[in-house]
Curated annotation (Swiss-Prot):
It comes from Thermoplasma volcanium (strain ATCC 51530 / DSM 4299 / JCM 9571 / NBRC 15438 / GSS1). This is DNA-directed RNA polymerase subunit Rpo11. The lineage of its organism: Archaea, Methanobacteriati, Thermoplasmatota, Thermoplasmata, Thermoplasmatales. It comes from the Archaea. GO terms for cellular component: cytoplasm; DNA-directed RNA polymerase complex. Pfam families: RNA_pol_L_2 (PF13656).
Length: 111
């Protein structure tokens, strides 16, 4: 399907079988999709996962996931939850380190 002319992100199920799914990722960056597919591949129930783009300018990327058992969309959801938690923890660590840096580098004035 041709790329939409908006900046909003969304997705669309292109096809769904018992053990596989293809999802079009509308206006998502390849960097994010690569990370998502790498996380999906860590799932023990996943046989295959990949993303591809038919044409880089006019088409949106699609993710393909095939599972041994369970639902393929569940594997995608599990991976998204894991990545969300990872980035949430990373954000908290960054905030903590920035605060620590600030408290160690405050210019102290004398009265």
């Amino acid at each position: 399907m041709q790329r939409e002319r908006t900046n909003e992100t969304s997705l669309r199920v292109v096809s769904k079988e018992k053990d596989s799914i293809i999802v079009e990722m509308i206006n998502y960056d390849n960097t994010l999709l690569r990370t998502l597919v790498e996380e999906i591949l860590k799932d023990d129930q996943v046989i295959e996962a990949r993303y591809y783009i038919k044409h880089p300018i006019i088409d949106n990327p699609q993710i393909y996931v095939k599972v041994k058992s369970g639902k393929p969309q569940a594997a995608i959801k599990r991976s998204i939850r894991k990545l969300s938690k990872l980035y949430e923890d990373l954000g908290a660590q960054v905030e903590k380190e920035i605060e620590k840096y600030r408290s160690n580098h405050i210019i102290k004035t004398t009265e």
